[in-house]
């Protein structure tokens, strides 16, 4: 693991230097930079937080909690900040080292700033964690024996735990998962395919732990995942004062729990009698949650977390529960291609050492949309719950555009609109126009724009689609329809999802086949919809044969999706 950490940090540093050597325009197009920021004001309660107006909205990869370097085209100076809050037309940035936004090159009227994704050397955190595994009591007594397959802890009574859940409103597989987690002597994994109520099971399990007086840690790779889990737990528990997040404040809309910079500053640090929940990223644990041993450590979205990162969390407790799905998005490693990076997922690695319970009842997709992911990724085990199985796309005003009506036929939940283009790279205008026209028809037919999402592999295609949407929809509707890459959509759902693949030129496909045909990304993209998924793709993607056995297998998965869909040749 040490070699992976060192190689990855070196690769990240080299990639950052390469990216920063490019002109601003190229950095923006790559999605790692936001240009056209104008300082507006400091936050009234905290002068280290300032609002910056966005010239064209946020079309980058940058999200709340990300580290950025704020600079100017005319100054060598820069400020290191964290994205504290993201709004429709502005970004709130918090200085990482505190202080006040008082630099004239930032605050002077008319000054335009640029925010780039920053490089932060996290290697010391990883190396300290790896060393602690060898030197601490938890490492020596729990982690090392478990990883070596020599853990001898006895399980609690599973049947007793299951019987205690008799009155729960969870389905049987959710009850199995919660009971297994509560009875696990050391570690248990819960696989949550799309829409199967993973967060619900997590919240009920944590609630029972807290009411039993346990101290619980919830951690994840992203702030958003931690916020979602804490929101669910606080709502289920009904005592938000027993739920906190530790770390530099990141804006959380409507959350009932509070954020504290350090654990010692919150009331729970002085409560030795009752159970409570702490949310924190793994990096925060070593510096802001010192000398706290949790009764249970819960890792959410574990499919995206690497094993070295998971160890930071595992060092804070003797029982570990991992919630995630190895068939959805995996870890992103600069030093490894996606297929190899996926194998470093803590969820995949630990599934060889601990039992896994797979949730199998979906509450999102109707029966027609459930078939392909169930057979392709989950061995036919995933089924639509009766309450959603028969659901169909319902348009209050009927289809307002006869040209796209076949694609919106409620009898066909999964549709492939087949294009004949052969020159698509990262932008394909015919697909962009078709996507915009479908959205326009849906909105005119009574569907809300916020119930529609368009998922793309390339940011330039997203920009082209937004351009066409602005010409067909009122401004507010165009903004509410999400057009983004699959990373933005994991964990979200919409009534209708449109997937625009864009690419079709043979040489381009040969270079990017490993990325375009990734099964995990495809799984996430097509399982966001409740009643309708429309795939816009050239027939070239169905017939192209990439080099390499692994990529050939991935391409076969994509073809199986198209074969499962109702095909419509593009004619609108």
Tell me the role of every PLM-derived stretch.
Residues 59-179, 240, 246, 253-259:
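Pre-ATPase regulatory/linker segments immediately N-terminal to the P-loop/RecA-like helicase/translocase core
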Residues 183-186, 199-214, 232-234:
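Walker A/P-loop NTP-binding motif
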Residues 211-214, 220-227, 283-299, 303-572:
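Conserved helicase motor core of SF1/SF2 NTP-dependent helicases
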Residues 224-255, 467-476:
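Conserved helix-turn-beta segment of the N-terminal RecA-like "Helicase ATP-binding" lobe
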Residues 236-286, 484:
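Inter-Walker segment of RecA-like/P-loop motor cores
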């Amino acid at each position: 693991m040490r070699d992976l950490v060192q190689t990855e940090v070196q690769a990240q540093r080299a990639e950052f230097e390469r990216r920063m050597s490019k002109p601003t325009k190229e950095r923006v197009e790559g999605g790692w930079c936001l240009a056209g920021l104008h300082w507006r004001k400091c936050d009234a309660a905290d002068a280290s937080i300032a609002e910056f107006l966005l010239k064209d909205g946020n079309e980058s990869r940058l999200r709340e909690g990300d580290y950025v370097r704020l600079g100017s085209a005319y100054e060598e100076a820069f400020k290191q900040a964290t994205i504290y809050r993201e709004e429709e037309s502005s970004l709130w940035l918090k200085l990482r080292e505190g202080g006040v936004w008082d630099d004239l090159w930032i605050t002077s009227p008319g000054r335009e700033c640029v925010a780039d994704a920053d490089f932060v050397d996290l290697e010391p955190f990883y190396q300290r964690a790896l060393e602690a595994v060898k030197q601490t009591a938890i490492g020596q007594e729990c982690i090392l024996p478990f990883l070596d397959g020599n853990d001898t802890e006895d399980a609690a009574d599973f049947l007793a735990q299951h019987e205690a859940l008799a009155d729960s409103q969870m389905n049987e597989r959710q009850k199995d998962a919660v009971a297994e987690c509560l009875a696990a002597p050391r570690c248990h994994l819960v696989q949550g395919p799309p829409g199967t109520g993973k967060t619900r099971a997590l919240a009920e399990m944590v609630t029972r732990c807290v009411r039993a007086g346990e101290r619980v840690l919830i951690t994840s790779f992203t702030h958003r995942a931690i916020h979602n889990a804490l929101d669910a737990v606080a709502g289920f528990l009904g005592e938000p004062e027993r739920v906190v997040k530790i770390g530099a404040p990141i804006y959380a809309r409507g959350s009932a729990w509070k954020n504290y910079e350090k654990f010692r500053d919150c009331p729970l640090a002085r409560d030795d009698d009752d159970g409570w929940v702490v949310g924190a990223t793994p990096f925060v644990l070593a510096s802001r949650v010192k000398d706290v041993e949790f009764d249970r450590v819960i890792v959410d979205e574990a499919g995206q977390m690497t094993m070295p990162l998971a160890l930071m969390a595992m060092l804070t407790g003797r029982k570990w529960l991992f919630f995630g799905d190895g068939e959805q998005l995996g870890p992103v490693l600069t030093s490894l291609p996606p297929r190899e990076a996926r194998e470093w997922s803590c969820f995949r690695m630990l599934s060889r050492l601990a039992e896994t319970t797979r949730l199998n009842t979906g509450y999102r997709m109707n029966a027609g949309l459930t078939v392909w992911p169930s057979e392709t990724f989950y061995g036919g085990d995933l089924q639509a719950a009766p309450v959603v199985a028969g659901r169909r796309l319902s348009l209050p005003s009927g289809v307002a555009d006869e040209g796209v009506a076949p694609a919106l036929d409620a009898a066909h939940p999964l549709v492939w609109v087949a294009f004949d283009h052969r020159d698509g790279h990262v932008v394909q205008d015919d697909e962009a126009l078709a996507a915009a026209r479908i959205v326009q028809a849906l909105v005119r037919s009574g569907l809300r724009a916020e119930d529609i999402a368009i998922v793309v592999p390339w940011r330039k295609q997203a920009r082209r689609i937004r351009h066409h949407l602005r010409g067909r929809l009122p401004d507010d509707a165009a903004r509410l329809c999400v057009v983004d890459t699959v990373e933005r959509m994991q964990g979200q759902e919409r009534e209708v999802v449109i997937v625009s693949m864009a690419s079709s030129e043979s040489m381009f496909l040969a270079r990017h086949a490993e990325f375009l045909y990734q099964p995990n990304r495809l799984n996430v993209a097509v399982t966001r919809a409740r009643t309708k998924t429309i795939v816009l793709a050239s027939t070239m993607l169905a017939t192209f044969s990439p080099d390499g056995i692994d990529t050939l297998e991935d391409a076969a998965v994509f073809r199986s999706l198209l074969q499962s869909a109702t095909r419509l040749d593009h004619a609108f």
